[in-house]
Amino acid sequence: MAETFLFTSESVNEGHPDKLCDQISDAVLDACLEQDPDSKVACETCTKTNMVMVFGEITTKANVDYEKIVRDTCRTIGFISDDVGLDADKCKVLVNIEQQSPDIAQGVHGHFTKRPEEVGAGDQGHMFGYATDETPELMPLTHVLATKLGSRLTEVRKNGTCAWLRPDGKTQVTIEYYNENGAMVPVRVHTVLISTQHDETVSNDQIAADLKEHVIKPVIPEKYLDEKTIFHLNPSGRFVIGGPHGDAGLTGRKIIIDTYGGWGAHGGGAFSGKDPTKVDRSGAYVVRQAAKSIVANGLARRCIVQVSYAIGVPEPLSVFVDSYGTGKIPDREILQIVKENFDFRPGMITINLDLKRGGNSRFLKTAAYGHFGRDDPDFTWEVVKPLKWEKPQA
């Protein structure tokens, strides 16, 4: 057997305080875009015991009831009493929203006068997109499994299968891989870790049994589990206090969970609460589409794409491609194909990926369980573009 290594990714589910904040910020974005597709939104959220605050810069024609959005989002997640960490109907809601800075507005969109191809990047920064052929989603298996475990925890809480569950929870998966000439091949699941909030009545034995039967079994393919797989199920022994009561929450604190679970790279910019002129979001979405399209079209088994911007400038400063040695043609040729097939100007990304369209909880859906690898028509950046290329003669 080839030499193997261990790699780990984590996830948190929708009741985690940081993820609660991401979801509120994106619910606000959805509400603004639904009424006014040209809304400029930079919405942050923070939370602690019995309090949620939304703050930031929003310029919109939309009539938005921020307090209602906060309470509805908290309620939908399951924060319906102080016992579970927050009471959606009784908590304090603070709102401190101002207009977008006129300095930024004139530089980016000329106070709404610029044509789409002339819209400048909303800020400087660099973003990465990643794809790998180890799963059908073209995402890392560690990240896919950690995310699906978190999603499944929420499912069995809401459908009553495990009535003792509460909204907050974290998951983590370690996988043994081998490196096949630059491509990642999963061998087995080494460790599964779940820490979930629970009510006072349930025993640790029942927690472990239910998690194995109702969460792990339906999510992790049997072929990856063996007698050596390690399970850490609520290893701290008690997790009754959770949500904002247990920990403060803040938008943009879970950027690796939102992306590739530690694989690839990250430029540092968060997604939630940002309209598409913010290249932290739109730039990261288009380079995911580029990386995914490279792998799906057979140009490489694994690949990373970087793009960078200057505030107020439409054209990217740089585009970079690395296929980790898995490319069927040289990386410089893959880069050329990427530049010919993808328009990295923010205004054009917005049009090509239809990013001004709110409603249908479109961006709210991205704010829990990952922005990438999702099978949902609203995730337009997951659509593979056909790329024309010629296989080199053998």
Swiss-Prot record:
List the EC numbers from the record: 2.5.1.6
Say which family it is in: Belongs to the AdoMet synthase family.
Pathway entry: Amino-acid biosynthesis; S-adenosyl-L-methionine biosynthesis; S-adenosyl-L-methionine from L-methionine: step 1/1
Where is it mainly found? cytoplasm
Binding positions (L-methionine):
57, 100, 247, 278
Q: Can you cite an annotated GO cellular component?
A: cytoplasm
Protein name, UniProt field: S-adenosylmethionine synthase
Binding residues annotated for Mg(2+), in chain numbering: 10
Q: Which UniProt keywords apply?
A: ATP-binding, Cobalt, Cytoplasm, Magnesium, Metal-binding, Nucleotide-binding, One-carbon metabolism, Potassium, Transferase
Function, in words: Catalyzes the formation of S-adenosylmethionine from methionine and ATP. The reaction comprises two steps that are both catalyzed by the same enzyme: formation of S-adenosylmethionine (AdoMet) and triphosphate, and subsequent hydrolysis of the triphosphate.
Task: Describe, as the record does, how this protein assembles with itself and its partners.
Answer: Homotetramer.
List the catalytic activities from the record: L-methionine + ATP + H2O = S-adenosyl-L-methionine + phosphate + diphosphate
User: A biological process (GO) annotation for this entry?
Assistant: S-adenosylmethionine biosynthetic process
List the gene name.
METK
Binding of ATP: at which residues? 16, 168-170, 236-239, 247, 253-254, 270, 274, 278
Cofactor(s) for this UniProt protein: Mn(2+); Mg(2+); Co(2+); K(+)
Where does the record place it? Cytoplasm
Q: Name one GO molecular function term.
A: ATP binding
Specify whether Cytoplasm is a keyword of the entry. Answer: yes
Cofactor comment text: Binds 2 divalent ions per subunit. The metal ions interact primarily with the substrate. Can utilize magnesium, manganese or cobalt (in vitro). Binds 1 potassium ion per subunit. The potassium ion interacts primarily with the substrate.
Keyword Cytoplasm listed? The answer is yes
